[in-house]
Amino acid sequence: MNPIVKSFEYGQHTVTLETGVIARQADAAVLASMGDTTVLVTVVGKKAEEPGRDFFPLTVNYQEKTYAAGKIPGGFFKREGRPSEGETLTARLIDRPIRPLFPNGFKNEVQVIITVVSVDPEISPEVISMIGTSAALSISGIPFNGPLGSARVGYVDGEYILNPTVSQLENSQLELSVAGTENAVLMVESEADALPEEVMLGAVVYGHEQQQVVIQAIKELKAEVNKPMWDWTAPVQNEELVAKVKDLAEAGLTEAYQIVVKQDRYAQVDVVKTAAKEALLAENPDADAREIDGLLGSLEKKVVRSRIIAGNPRIDGREPDMVRALSVMAGVLPRTHGSALFTRGETQALVTCTLGTERDAQKIDSIMGEQTSRFMLHYNFPPYSVGETGMVGSPKRREIGHGKLAWRGIHAVMPTAEEFPYSIRVVSEITESNGSSSMASVCGTSLALMDAGVPIKTSVAGIAMGLVKEGDDFVVLSDILGDEDHLGDMDFKVAGTRDGVTALQMDIKIEGITKEIMQIALQQAYGARVHILNVMDQAISGHRAEISDHAPRITTLKINPEKIRDVIGKGGATIRALTEETGTTIELEDDGTVKIASANGDATKEAIRRIQEITAEVEVGTVYNGKVVRIVDFGAFVTILPGKDGLVHISQIAEERVANVSDYLEVGQEVKVKVMEVDRQGRVRLSMKEAQPKEEAASE
């Protein structure tokens, strides 16, 4: 075994790429390390293309092994199971920038598997996983127009930080991942604390500049490995068939794309394509139907793009910077804690907000450690939203990714636990879709949170931008349709407030997207965002003063930390009885903080009263209403507070001499007693005689 190793300094860490020792039967395998965080990346491709396949079957699997952090998995089986949400998001993060780097026409199956085998809790595996993937693909011999670089950028005290540690990110106003080739940015994913557009763009440029050292190192590794490239050539286009397809379908497609309503337009496009295909197959029955479909798709793309570049109105008749018609409603569902219906053209999101207690928070156990998330956002994309049938069940990768993007857009304006001690779950149901449903979810979430009475800092809106570029000519499109997303060169989603950007996601399919183009897109997005915020503010411009009557109201009180055990009781008996009898949820913290949650105000008051009784201190000189619990020859034991008994000596029962206690008292009798003394052992001495002059009993 002859290892080939390449090391370089990258930000605060040393990156090492090694190949030739592990997983040698794969087309390529790279052991990539950043500090003590190490991933094994393997690439395998099938040499033979499956006949009739009309798509590129690339699979990216990212898996975190618990042994990497020195842990044993939980659960009955004690082994890793299905991918977590975090693993799914990382797999998407890697897939997005590498997919456009495979050549057009390449349809051989390729599988990339990234396995985290060692982890430093201060160094997240995402960046080194992307670097390792780029290196493995570059040395595999598989057609790949890389290499690709990757960087994470933080922003602290007005300075950009390259590949910040987990601790540094806690104080950072920005967490931005950027990936690209030597000449082009391909992917951006970020979350920010409402930063100005120029700071966001500066972070993208900074990250792309810094990752050049990665690209250079991978080039050197590729030269040293020197593996022969696959003998693959792009399929030759049948120019005669291209001309026939154009003659038969171009005019019809041009007309079809002037139909504004999506479903009607799709129906007409299908009519045109079917007629052209049938005519070509009638002329030549041996023609490849899939090839015809591909050429019709290419022609469709060309028709739409050429109209936009020529300055004609867009598919639905809008100008490039126009946002579709908006409809905004808050409080649309009667029993939810908060709800909103946000409609932008043919994209619609029904968003609900549910408030819960701290025990409803999501507990995340990953190799980076345990975390608790009080704010959850789930995105659902049912098939009916696009007029189709399909499977309904657990969320797919896309739904998880879109939900996380919307979460990032809102997270910066969420209140702290001290400001609002609730767990919050938002669900966005996409009921109609024609482009930018994740950004509709951002708008709907902002509205639903305010309707629920959540004190978010300010409203947030999101917009999806697109780009069509031919040579030096380009047009930036605001609020793109699904077709414009599919046929365009860039998908550029921006969420933010009036003051700045909270989330930015960018996927670029071509080279040549300059800083100036991105600047224009960000400025155009700002104008669209402010327009949407103005419309949203007409429906609801601030959070409701009161939370819903159906939501649990959380009341917080403080008790002596030494009294926590009294509230819990033996084996939890006291707190269990409290919650069952009052119908409340009670949470105790080590510092003596007690949180009582209930939608019923009277139940909350009763729980508070009983907790105060349990935790109250016996005060010397105070008169209590007590209950006789036991009679003995020398007096009676009286309960004055829950769990606190005192002795009334026979001499303290009455002014006159008492010969027999039972003549004056019986078990269960309520009496007024005054606390005379509490000795060092906590024993309480009571007197009925001394309590008699008191007109009122002390109430605790």
Curated annotation (Swiss-Prot):
The keyword Cytoplasm applies. Mg(2+) binds at residues 485, 491. GO terms for molecular function: 3'-5'-RNA exonuclease activity; magnesium ion binding; polyribonucleotide nucleotidyltransferase activity; RNA binding. One of its GO terms (cellular component) is cytosol. Keywords: Cytoplasm, Magnesium, Metal-binding, Nucleotidyltransferase, RNA-binding, Transferase. One of its GO terms (biological process) is mRNA catabolic process. PROSITE patterns: KH_TYPE_1, S1. It is found in: Cytoplasm. Pfam families: KH_1 (PF00013), PNPase (PF03726), RNase_PH (PF01138), RNase_PH_C (PF03725), S1 (PF00575). InterPro entries: ExoRNase_PH_dom1, ExoRNase_PH_dom2, ExoRNase_PH_dom2_sf, KH_dom, KH_dom_type_1, KH_dom_type_1_sf, NA-bd_OB-fold, PNPase. Its cofactor is Mg(2+). It is an enzyme of class 2 (transferase). Its EC number is 2.7.7.8. It catalyses: RNA(n+1) + phosphate = RNA(n) + a ribonucleoside 5'-diphosphate. It comes from the Bacteria. Residues 621-689 form the S1 motif domain. Residues 552-611 form the KH domain. HAMAP family: PNPase. Involved in mRNA degradation. Catalyzes the phosphorolysis of single-stranded polyribonucleotides processively in the 3'- to 5'-direction. PANTHER family: POLYRIBONUCLEOTIDE NUCLEOTIDYLTRANSFERASE, POLYRIBONUCLEOTIDE NUCLEOTIDYLTRANSFERASE 1, MITOCHONDRIAL. Component of the RNA degradosome, which is a multiprotein complex involved in RNA processing and mRNA degradation. Belongs to the polyribonucleotide nucleotidyltransferase family. This is Polyribonucleotide nucleotidyltransferase. It comes from Shewanella loihica (strain ATCC BAA-1088 / PV-4). The gene is pnp.
